[in-house]
Amino acid sequence: MNQVAVVIGGGQTLGAFLCHGLAAEGYRVAVVDIQSDKAANVAQEINAEYGESMAYGFGADATSEQSVLALSRGVDEIFGRVDLLVYSAGIAKAAFISDFQLGDFDRSLQVNLVGYFLCAREFSRLMIRDGIQGRIIQINSKSGKVGSKHNSGYSAAKFGGVGLTQSLALDLAEYGITVHSLMLGNLLKSPMFQSLLPQYATKLGIKPDQVEQYYIDKVPLKRGCDYQDVLNMLLFYASPKASYCTGQSINVTGGQVMF
C-alpha cells in the first residue's frame, strides 16, 4: 500500500492510537500535533515497529490558517500525496452557561470546528489535484447530535461539525472524495474525560469516582467507548467497501444515540 493518512491531533491519546492502527494496516502516516515533540515521538514509534519512512511527525496549529498551509506543503513535499485525512484534534470545557467564558467558547469553536474546516479545505485540494478519491473523517461526538449539559461550547462546535461534514460531502462528491463524522460515545478512560471528572461530579452532585459508572449506566451495551471501537469504524469508512457512503454522522455510542 502506498496510501498516506494525515492525522490531526495524532501525537497523543486517541489520535496516537489511530496513527498506530493506520500504520498497522499499511498506511504511511503524517502524525500532526500542536506539540511537535509528541508528534515526533509517535512517528518514531511507528517507524521502529513498521519500518523507516512509514511515518513523519509535524508540529502544526490547526486553528491557524498559515500553520495549516505550511503543514499541507510539508506533507506534500515529504509524502507527495494524501489519501485520508483524520481530524482528531479536540478540546472540551465544562461550565454552567452563566459561568461560561467567551474565550473558552471561542476556543472550542476554533479547535473543534475551524481547524476541521481549514484542514479539510487544504488537504482536499491535494486530493483533487492528484485525482485521488480520498476520504475525510472527522472524529466527532454524540454531543454533536444531542445537546450536552454544561458543555455549550463543545456541543455547539460538534453540531457545527456535522453540518460542515455534510457540506464538504456535497462539494467533494464529484471528485469521488467522501466525508464522514464519527459520533463517539464517552471515551471514559481518555485523558480529556478523566480531566473533566471533577467538573462532571459537581454538575451531577456525585463523587468523582462515581462519574464513570453514571455514564456507563446510560449506555445500552453497558460500557464506554474504546479507542479500538473508533479505529474499527475509521478503517471501514476509509476503505473502498464504504465508497458509496458519504456525508454521514456515524454513531459509535453503544446504542446511547440511535439517530
Curated annotation (Swiss-Prot):
Keywords of this entry: NAD, Oxidoreductase
EC number(s) reported in the record: 1.1.1.140
Chain residues that bind substrate: 141
Binding site for NAD(+): 4-33
SUPFAM superfamilies registered for this protein in UniProt: NAD(P)-binding Rossmann-fold domains
Pathway listed: Carbohydrate metabolism; D-sorbitol degradation; D-fructose 6-phosphate from D-sorbitol 6-phosphate: step 1/1
EC top class, as a word: oxidoreductase
Alphabetized GO MF terms: identical protein binding; oxidoreductase activity, acting on the CH-OH group of donors, NAD or NADP as acceptor; sorbitol-6-phosphate 2-dehydrogenase activity
Regions crossing the membrane: none
Alphabetized InterPro entries for the sequence: NAD(P)-bd_dom_sf, Sc_DH/Rdtase_CS, SDR_fam
Catalytic activity: D-sorbitol 6-phosphate + NAD(+) = beta-D-fructose 6-phosphate + NADH + H(+)
Biological process terms in GO annotation: protein homotetramerization; sorbitol catabolic process
Segments forming a coiled coil: none
Catalytic center residues: 154
Disulfide linkage: none
GO-annotated cellular components: protein-containing complex
Family: Belongs to the short-chain dehydrogenases/reductases (SDR) family.
PANTHER family: 5-KETO-D-GLUCONATE 5-REDUCTASE (PTHR43669), SHORT-CHAIN TYPE DEHYDROGENASE_REDUCTASE-RELATED (PTHR43669:SF8)
Quaternary structure and interacting proteins, as annotated: Homotetramer.
The protein's name: Sorbitol-6-phosphate 2-dehydrogenase
Organism: Escherichia coli (strain K12)
Lineage summary: Bacteria, Pseudomonadati, Pseudomonadota, Gammaproteobacteria, Enterobacterales
